[in-house]
A protein has these predicted regions:
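Intrinsically disordered, low-complexity segments enriched in glycine/proline and serine/threonine
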Residues: 5, 15-16, 50, 135-136, ...
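Short, contiguous acidic/charged loop-to-helix segments that flank catalytic cores in large enzymes
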Residues: 23-35, 51-55, 72-79
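Extended, hydrophobic/aromatic-rich amphipathic alpha-helical segments that build helical scaffolds
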Residues: 33-65, 84-96
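Long, intrinsically disordered, low-complexity segments
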Residues: 28, 32-33, 67, 76-150
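Flexible, polar/acidic helix-loop-strand segments at domain edges
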Residues: 1, 6-37
């Protein structure tokens, strides 16, 4: 998988400049770099904690760290369902343009509903493409050969 590298010093840290395919004009690398941000860890924790135990102080603390950083008020006193919705909103806001929204919707079980509504409103001719058959990606062939039970 390729990762496009920007010209900023922050982006260059992900680049292996010694690779043959790297040049000033083509700032790409074939390195696969899994990235997990602290915000992801906080949201994963808050979501899991809320599902297991409801909105605990620890779950609120995790979400509120992100909200304070963004200049927003702390959350408190929410029901489990309302806190779940708040966490989902934080995921959406925190990961905008990171191409993981689809995966979150699938995990939350809301992908088909949300996407059908979106396509019906914006591209009604394409709503027929939002189907359960297209919900999950196929298992990679290599993995299927190793484990035929997939």
């Amino acid at each position: 998988s390729e990762m496009c590298i920007r010209d900023s010093p922050h982006g260059k840290k992900w680049c292996d400049g010694g690779r043959e395919n790297f040049s000033q004009r083509n700032k790409r690398t074939d390195m696969y770099i899994p990235i997990i941000r602290y915000a992801d860890v906080l949201l994963i924790f808050a979501e899991a904690e809320n599902e297991a135990n409801g909105p605990t102080a620890a779950a609120y603390d995790a979400v509120n760290q992100l909200r304070v950083r963004a200049g927003l008020d702390n959350l408190s006193g929410l029901s489990k369902e309302t806190f779940r919705q708040a966490i989902q909103k934080e995921w959406t806001l925190e990961t905008t343009h990171e191409r993981i929204y689809r995966f979150n919707l699938v995990r939350w079980g809301t992908y088909l509903t949300v996407m059908k509504e979106y396509f019906q409103k914006n591209f009604p001719e394409k709503v027929k493409n939002v189907t359960e058959e297209r919900l999950y990606f196929p298992c990679p062939e290599h993995d299927s050969l190793i484990n035929p039970n997939l």
